[in-house]
Amino acid sequence: MPSLPPAIFLMGPTAAGKTDLAMALADALPCELISVDSALIYRGMDIGTAKPSRELLARYPHRLIDIRDPAESYSAAEFRADALAAMAEATARGRIPLLVGGTMLYYKALLEGLADMPGADPEVRAALEAEARAEGWEALHRQLAEVDPESAARIHPNDPQRLMRALEVYRVGGVSMSELRRRQSAEKADFDASGRNQLPYTVAQLAIAPEQRQVLHARIAQRFRQMLEQGFIAEVEALHARSDLHAGLPSIRAVGYRQVWDYLDGKLSYAEMTERGIIATRQLAKRQFTWLRSWSHLHWMDSLAGDNLPRALKYLKTVSILA
C-alpha cells in the first residue's frame, strides 16, 4: 500500500470523453468526483459547458460544480484550496479523490503549488480601472510591457482581468508576476526524478483523447451544433439580459459563450457564430494538448478504444493506487 493516500487525475482535451470514463471509474471504485473545469463552476451555464445533466449529477455527484455565479471570479488559488479540502474530505471517508476535467492550470496549481503573489488591493484595482476608462486597456498593456514584458507577451490587451492582475501584482509588491513565478520554479520542481509533487497524495495521472486529431475536431463540431439545438442561445440570452454581466467577465469569455454573446450583440451572423465557436473550441483543445505534451507521468488512453475502463483499472494497480 502507498505511504500516502491515493488520488486519480483524469485529464484530456475538451470533447475527449473524460466524463464518461470518470463515471465508469466511479462505478468500479470507491471514488468521489471532483471537477477540474473553470467553466463548470458557474451556475446557469449548463449547455455551453457540456455540464452533466441533473440526473447524472444526482447519480454521480461532482464537487466544485455550480459553486459561483457568472458575475463572480474564481482564481487558481481558490480552486487549489477548494480542491484540497474536497480531497481531504474524500480521503477521510475512505474514498479515492478522482479529479476530472480539462483546466490544466488548475492541475498545475495542485501539483506545484502557487507562487506567493500579493493579495488583491481594492485601491490599486480602482486606480487601474480609472486609468483604463481614461486611457484604454491598450495603454495599460503598454505599462505592463515596460515592467513585465514576459507577462505582456502572454496577456492580450483585450483580457482586462489578467492584465489588471499582472499590473496589480507589480504595483502592490514592486516585483513582476514573471519574476515571482521564476522564484517559485526555482524553489519547487514540477516533478523531481522520483516523481514527487507538492500534493500529500500518491497521484495516478490518466489522460484520454482520440489518437487521430481529426476525430476530435469532428466531435467538437458535432457537439457545438448539438448545443445550439439544445438551447444554447437561449441560455446565453438569459445571461445577456442581466445588467451585472458583460463580455469582459471570465464566465462570458468562456469558449462558445463569447461567440454567442457577440451574436446576440449583432456582431456576428448565426453562421459566423457557429464557425467561430467551433474554431475557438478547437483552439482550446490545441492549448490543452500543448499542456499535456509537457506533462510528466501520464498514462494515455484512446477515446475510441472499447476497453478503457479495464485498462485504467490495470494501470491503477501497477502504480499502487489499487491493491
From Swiss-Prot:
Binding site for ATP: G12, P13, T14, A15, A16, G17, K18, T19
Listed InterPro entries: Dimethylallyltransferase (IPR039657), IPT (IPR018022), P-loop_NTPase (IPR027417)
Pfam families, per database record: IPPT
Keywords (A to Z) from UniProt: ATP-binding, Magnesium, Nucleotide-binding, Transferase, tRNA processing
Residues that, per the record, bind substrate: T14, A15, A16, G17, K18, T19
Site (Interaction with substrate tRNA): T103, R125
Catalyzed reactions per annotation: adenosine(37) in tRNA + dimethylallyl diphosphate = N(6)-dimethylallyladenosine(37) in tRNA + diphosphate
Cofactor field: Mg(2+)
Disulfide topology: none
Gene3D superfamilies: 1.10.20.140, P-loop containing nucleotide triphosphate hydrolases (3.40.50.300)
Class of this enzyme: transferase
Biological process according to GO: tRNA modification
Entry's EC annotation: 2.5.1.75
Job of this protein: Catalyzes the transfer of a dimethylallyl group onto the adenine at position 37 in tRNAs that read codons beginning with uridine, leading to the formation of N6-(dimethylallyl)adenosine (i(6)A).
Complexes and interactors: Monomer.
NCBIfam families: miaA
Family membership: Belongs to the IPP transferase family.
Protein name, per record: tRNA dimethylallyltransferase
Annotated organism of origin: Pseudomonas paraeruginosa (strain DSM 24068 / PA7) (Pseudomonas aeruginosa (strain PA7))
Gene of this entry: miaA
